[in-house]
């Protein structure tokens, strides 16, 4: 369901300022499915999920983590930073 983590300047700024991680997911995935998958895979709690379809036809999800979890810490644990 989760295809990859987006690592762009905007994605890193969102992780730092708004505690959000940015993912590319399957087009058929619902917000609830995305939230459950992120919670299961990364052992964090999700507060909110926003999605959009990019001009390239990919589905992008902005996943806001609860205050107990830090998006930058998660990205560094995953080896993205």
From Swiss-Prot:
GO biological-process terms attached to the record: translation
Family stated for the protein in its record: Belongs to the universal ribosomal protein uL23 family.
NCBIfam families documented for this protein: PRK14548.1, uL23_arch
Keyword Hydrolase found: no
GO cellular component: cytosolic large ribosomal subunit
Pfam families assigned: Ribosomal_L23
Residues in coiled coil: none
Classification via Gene3D superfamilies: 3.30.70.330
The protein's name: Large ribosomal subunit protein uL23
Domain of life: Archaea
Subunit and partners: Part of the 50S ribosomal subunit. Contacts protein L29.
Its biological purpose: Binds to 23S rRNA. One of the proteins that surrounds the polypeptide exit tunnel on the outside of the ribosome.
Molecular-function GO terms, alphabetical: rRNA binding; structural constituent of ribosome
Keywords, sorted A to Z: Ribonucleoprotein, Ribosomal protein, RNA-binding, rRNA-binding
KW Kinase (keyword) present: no
Protein source organism: Pyrobaculum aerophilum (strain ATCC 51768 / DSM 7523 / JCM 9630 / CIP 104966 / NBRC 100827 / IM2)
